[in-house]
Amino acid sequence: MNIFNPNHDRKAIVIFSGGQDSTTCLFQAIAEYGKENIEAITFQYGQRHAIELEKARTIAQDLGIKQTLIDTSVMKAITHNALMDEQAHIEQKENELPNTFVDGRNALFLLYAAIYAKGQGIQDIITGVCETDFSGYPDCRDVFIKSMNVTLNLAMDYPIPISKTPLMYLTKAQTWQLADELGVLDYVQKHTHTCYEGIEGGCRKCPSCILRNKGLKKYLTQKGRKNV
């Protein structure tokens, strides 16, 4: 993977949750744009666990990145899902989306990020969505991102290329590889939060933990074989 392609004449904002994917994107953005040209935007959408926001804040402070927190918790009043209901049991029924899917979340995030970017003179928006190793979320697909790009350009008359989706076609193992190539695999493993249950270090049982740990194990196995 070619990950170092300095683009220091532009500014970018990373949609940042404090999870593995968005943190990897943040590190890649720093390498590509320079830390002084990067900002992070985080959304409080009514997620069931505060640890997600705490991790995002801590990482942004640790890296010296300006972080903007936007409250979109009104979503709890108009939609229901397991990510915003502490009492809900996380599950996925056959031929249905997982009940962790938040209707309209990524569309809303991109809209607010675009509004902020235009106001700050930021050219690029980076998001860690991926359609390779994902749970079937329709708003993680490349076709959706491209559609939002067109929609926002038309709505705001501002050429924001939301096409910055560096993880779109990477497996979870390849995302770990990218973190390793950036020299931050240990940091991402130690400091990011992915667990749907909000457990520090992960519950190892929820779909998100399983995908994360399976990807890490696969990458480390492949890396070990190459080093033999």
From Swiss-Prot:
The record's catalysed reaction(s) read: 7-carboxy-7-deazaguanine + NH4(+) + ATP = 7-cyano-7-deazaguanine + ADP + phosphate + H2O + H(+)
Part of which pathway?
A: Purine metabolism; 7-cyano-7-deazaguanine biosynthesis
Q: Where does Zn(2+) bind?
A: 195, 203, 206, 209
Name the CDD domains for this protein: QueC-like
Which EC number(s) are documented for this chain? 6.3.4.20
Task: Give the keywords, sorted.
Answer: ATP-binding, Ligase, Metal-binding, Nucleotide-binding, Queuosine biosynthesis, Zinc
Keyword Transport listed: no
Q: Which Gene3D superfamilies match?
A: HUPs
Q: Which GO terms describe its molecular function?
A: ATP binding; ligase activity, forming carbon-nitrogen bonds; zinc ion binding
In the UniProt record, does the keyword Transmembrane helix occur? Answer: no
Cofactor binding comment, as recorded: Binds 1 zinc ion per subunit.
GO BP: any one term: queuosine biosynthetic process
Binding-site positions, ATP = 16-26
Which InterPro entries did the record assign? Answer: QueC (IPR018317), Rossmann-like_a/b/a_fold (IPR014729)
Cofactor(s) for this protein?
Answer: Zn(2+)
Q: What family name appears in the similarity comment?
A: Belongs to the QueC family.
Physiological role: Catalyzes the ATP-dependent conversion of 7-carboxy-7-deazaguanine (CDG) to 7-cyano-7-deazaguanine (preQ(0)).
The protein's name in its UniProt record: 7-cyano-7-deazaguanine synthase
